[in-house]
Amino acid sequence: MKNSIVRTKTGVSYLYPFIVITSLFFLWGFAHSILDVLNKHFQEVLVISKARSALVQAVVYGGYFLMALPAGIFMKRFGYRWGVILGLVLYGIGALMFYPGSFLMSFNFFLFSLFIIGCGLTCLETAANPYVTILGEPEMSASRLNLSQSFNGLGWIVGPFVGG
């Protein structure tokens, strides 16, 4: 049987879940890299100061600070799959909140949306990092994690091109 970083010795393949989880690494790299682009747009469109626009990063990373432990507890109780689902739901809600925010033109509303996105990203990272390590043989877990993390970097590169 052909060796693979996502196949067990018994022949079970985890290729599909690995691809799905690895795409999440790209997603959160993209989300982080687009923050600076959003920041500049908020300064111009909403006419806010550079100091006030620093709240963009503060609320996203505040979501990490406040959600990290609850996300870990959630994962311990319900598992990685439900952690990924919770993260995607929160991320999606935060992103969808940008639509009414575009009508309200309220910086505070956008900040709340970004906070929800940050909470979702926290759940995704808390679940995806350990989950990708169990999708195959244990001795290949570092290789799987490194490969997945490389897509995070790709998201960081692509984000400003899409948002700019």
Residue locations for each model-derived region?
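Extracytoplasmic
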Residues: 16-48, 128-129
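Membrane-interface helix termini in secondary transporters
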Residues: 41, 72-73, 77
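Central cavity-lining transmembrane alpha-helices of secondary-active solute carriers
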Residues: 55-73
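MFS transmembrane alpha-helix packing/gate-lining sites
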Residues: 63-67, 120, 155
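C-terminal ends and interior cores of transmembrane alpha-helices
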Residues: 89-104
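Intracellular juxtamembrane helix-capping segments at the cytosolic ends
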Residues: 123-137
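Glycine-rich segments within core transmembrane alpha-helices of 12-TM secondary carriers
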Residues: 140-163
